[in-house]
Amino acid sequence: MIGHLRGIIVEKQPPYLLLEVAGVGYEITAPLSTFYHLPEPQEEILLYTHLIVREDAHTLYGFHNDHERRLFRALIKVNGVGPKLALAILSGIGPDEFVHCVLNQNIDQLVRIPGVGRKTAERLVIETKDRLSRWHTNDTPSPEGLRSSNTQPTQDAISALMALGYKPQEAKRAIDAIQKPDLSAETLIRLALKQMVLGT
């Protein structure tokens, strides 16, 4: 099991990034909550990792801190929640907001995440509440001050939202509603998700 990787970011395009470690490039899938903390390409970063091995693929997931990774591991243990949905949850609502929803049994907010129906939301609360009540974190992602290395932040943001399960029309409508094309892709995604999932 690979516990963490320290290396240089070669490229990043949510939800994927390429990390070079000792001359080897690792393709890593990460939630948007992690992307909010990433430096620019060619800078060094430490990512906590979780490797999932299947017959057709070995997928390496990366996280900004151990709290995010523990939450991801708790999510994939829930009946009906696989890695893709777990990633969508962390991307769509953020680790701290998810914990808040679970502890307060806010089913209505959870079902606004793409791929999460009412039954899944109820299982998330039932199966993770006790564990999450024992966890505490002060790590709150913030998109402020982050820059995108891509020259097409709007298109990148729309593509990232589609990768999370939103329809093309929904993604474009959410990005267009922000009306700030000069923002980075990460910030556009964050604001769009806040609008679609949290309703603010």
Swiss-Prot record:
Keywords: Cytoplasm, DNA damage, DNA recombination, DNA repair, DNA-binding. Residues 144-148 are annotated as: Flexible linker. The RuvA-RuvB-RuvC complex processes Holliday junction (HJ) DNA during genetic recombination and DNA repair, while the RuvA-RuvB complex plays an important role in the rescue of blocked DNA replication forks via replication fork reversal (RFR). RuvA specifically binds to HJ cruciform DNA, conferring on it an open structure. The RuvB hexamer acts as an ATP-dependent pump, pulling dsDNA into and through the RuvAB complex. HJ branch migration allows RuvC to scan DNA until it finds its consensus sequence, where it cleaves and resolves the cruciform DNA. GO terms for biological process: DNA recombination; DNA repair. Has three domains with a flexible linker between the domains II and III and assumes an 'L' shape. Domain III is highly mobile and contacts RuvB. One of its GO terms (cellular component) is cytoplasm. The keyword rRNA-binding does not apply. Homotetramer. Forms an RuvA(8)-RuvB(12)-Holliday junction (HJ) complex. HJ DNA is sandwiched between 2 RuvA tetramers; dsDNA enters through RuvA and exits via RuvB. An RuvB hexamer assembles on each DNA strand where it exits the tetramer. Each RuvB hexamer is contacted by two RuvA subunits (via domain III) on 2 adjacent RuvB subunits; this complex drives branch migration. In the full resolvosome a probable DNA-RuvA(4)-RuvB(12)-RuvC(2) complex forms which resolves the HJ. One of its GO terms (molecular function) is four-way junction DNA binding. Belongs to the RuvA family. This is Holliday junction branch migration complex subunit RuvA. It is found in: Cytoplasm. Disulfide bonds: none annotated. It comes from the Bacteria.
